[in-house]
From Swiss-Prot:
Name of the protein this chain belongs to: tRNA-specific 2-thiouridylase MnmA
Disulfide bond entries: 109-202
Protein origin, superkingdom: Bacteria
Gene name linked to the record: mnmA
Enzyme class, spelled out: transferase
Cited InterPro entries: MnmA-like, MnmA-like_C, MnmA-like_central, MnmA-like_central_sf, Rossmann-like_a/b/a_fold
GO CC annotations on file: cytoplasm
């Protein structure tokens, strides 16, 4: 029997994780709930439909976590990382949007909070044999692998974790599908059995994103320009509200639909192109920074990558790795590979590592407006 601390979020996945560890594997289980966002302290007003509710979603999750702990007869503790989350994850998110990039906060939330500050707190206060979460992934010998349920696999979001962070982590849901997890919860009358999965920004939740950003970044209006003709075809309130390839641009009176082809942040220009024009979204090579190498013994001939979550794997070749910078090529080409997002590399089921997409190229030329 081992002493295991479970990150209990108040959702069905972490609830079943705790149930499996205690009642199927007979471990000593301690639950810890993290509170990482405070809508009032963080000025989360615009775009927040929950702001006037009697109980905010974070407190509702805490109530559900306490109910699960009571059902399972395990102790539960609460820890507050609101300041740490704001300083180490949220300020990065806002600055990336301010720079016209499209960040992935969930990956840094995992690196710095769920598997950073949380592990530090748990080690100091409980000294467990292992730490468990309800993520869909596998860890073997401090290496990261995909989960059995490819549709729910979260190794993409865990790609910035170090081997040191992974060494005491276990994922009890690694070989289970979501249907099986909900069945286990229902058969054992767990109060979270039918609870909706959390979506939106890590620990913040669903928001009207344009309004949400206005809480933190002032509008920066500028021209919408046809990238082929250089003609001004409209106005925007800020390039941060648009992402590469986006088609919802609200241009009226146009003969054909347009998509976002890029931007010039300095001159506040949003470039668009007609769907009948040349494809301005393609790339066949990228540079990524802050690359985190998890598996050093990978097979160079068997590599694939994802440029966004749930994307089908695409074959790639590593051209160069220099400290924490990597260059890769993908001869089959790909559309809308977006700076600020993460590229995550796989060798079969093994997650080799991941980094932040910094630049993209097409046929030897830099995509200067991506």
């Amino acid at each position: 029997m081992s002493k295991i601390v479970v990150a209990l979020s108040g959702g069905v996945d972490s609830s079943v994780t705790a149930f499996i560890l205690k009642y199927q594997q007979n471990h000593e289980v301690i639950a810890v709930f993290m509170r990482n966002w405070d809508s009032f302290a963080n000025n989360d007003i615009l775009g927040n439909e929950d702001i006037n509710q009697d109980i905010c979603p974070q407190e509702k999750d805490w109530e559900d976590a306490k109910k699960i702990a009571s059902q399972l007869n395990i102790p539960i503790y609460r820890v507050d990382f609101v300041k740490e989350y704001y300083d180490e994850v949220f300020t990065y998110l806002i600055e990336e949007y301010r720079q016209g990039r499209t960040p992935n906060p969930d990956i840094f939330c995992n690196k710095y909070i769920k598997f950073g500050k949380f592990i530090e707190y748990v080690e100091k206060n409980f000294n467990p044999d292992f730490i468990a979460t309800g993520h869909y992934a596998k860890v073997e010998n401090s290496l990261l692998y995909r989960a059995k349920d490819r549709n729910k696999d979260q190794s993409y979001f865990l790609s910035q974790l170090s081997s040191d962070q992974l060494k005491k982590i276990i994922f009890p849901l690694k070989d289970l599908t979501k249907d099986v997890i909900r069945k286990i919860a229902a058969e054992n009358n767990l109060v979270t059995a039918q609870k909706k999965d959390s979506t939106g920004i890590c620990f913040i939740g669903e928001r009207n994103f344009d309004k949400f950003l206005q809480n933190y970044i002032p509008n920066m209006p500028g021209n919408i320009v046809d990238i082929e003709t250089n003609e001004v075809v409209g106005q925007h309130v800020g390039v941060m509200y648009y992402t590469l390839g986006q088609r919802k641009i609200n241009l009226s009176g146009m003969k054909y639909p347009y998509y976002v082809a890029g931007h010039d942040l300095k001159n506040k220009i949003l470039y668009v192109a007609s769907i009948h024009s040349k494809n301005y979204l393609k790339s066949d090579k990228l540079e990524a920074i802050e690359f985190n190498l998890i598996n050093k013994n990978f097979n160079k001939k068997n590599l694939t990558a994802k440029f966004r979550y749930r994307q089908e794997d695409i074959k790639i070749e590593i051209l160069n790795i220099d400290k924490n910078k990597i260059e890769i090529s993908y001869p089959d080409e790909f559309e809308a590979v977006t700076p600020g997002q993460h590229v995550v590399i796989y060798d079969g089921e093994s997650c080799v590592g991941g980094g932040i997409i910094n630049k993209t190229y097409y046929k030897g030329n830099l995509n200067q407006f991506h």
